[in-house]
Amino acid sequence: MCLESKPGNSKTLSLINQGYQILAEYQLVEQEQLRGIYAIPSYSSCLLWFGVIFIHSGCYAESVFRFSILLPDQFPNERTLPTVIFQQDIFHPHICPISHSLDLRCLLKDWVKDEHHIWHILKYIQAIFADPEGSIIGNGVARPLTELNNFKAFHLLSQNRIDYVLRVRNSILWSCKHMFDKPPIKDPHYIVLERYLPHKHLAVMKSSHSQ
């Protein structure tokens, strides 16, 4: 007996298959064991990922930046790049001061299934904050202005690093002030940060060490 294939069934199977592929992406992220940066698919939609990066060195040290990764509808089968949007304005040549989006064109021109992965994006995010000067240089020369999202940040970084660091400091202070804000959306997978409470967290630490 052959089951009739209906358009609705085909779409459902396609979504299930996509879900498994995105779950595989998350497993690859875990296998990379990246330090200081975390990302997880939203509970409500696997095409939306929540992320946060903790920066401990360089001119962005002490900052905690939240971001979202929006995957294209046909991910990973279409060549359109994912979209990375930070929750706040961050002064950086590759981050748009209006939309807070990160330009991924310096990393990838198109998305290629089985060759490119979400952990590549996470490592790129780490790299642009660890070495902002290096992020605006490609093959020993400055990147074209068309590959930059914030010309003022590019100019200051190139000509006056002291002023650049002062502007970056504003981004750091804002991130520290708002890192414990309530989640903007109700999603159980949203990454929530809590203030350190000895009576609560010491018990958790002791429990984890005893296992």
From Swiss-Prot:
PROSITE patterns: UBC_2 (PS50127). SUPFAM superfamilies: UBC-like. Residues 17-177 form the UBC core domain. Gene3D superfamilies: Ubiquitin Conjugating Enzyme. It comes from the Eukaryota. Pfam families: UQ_con. Belongs to the ubiquitin-conjugating enzyme family. FTS subfamily. This is Protein crossbronx-like.
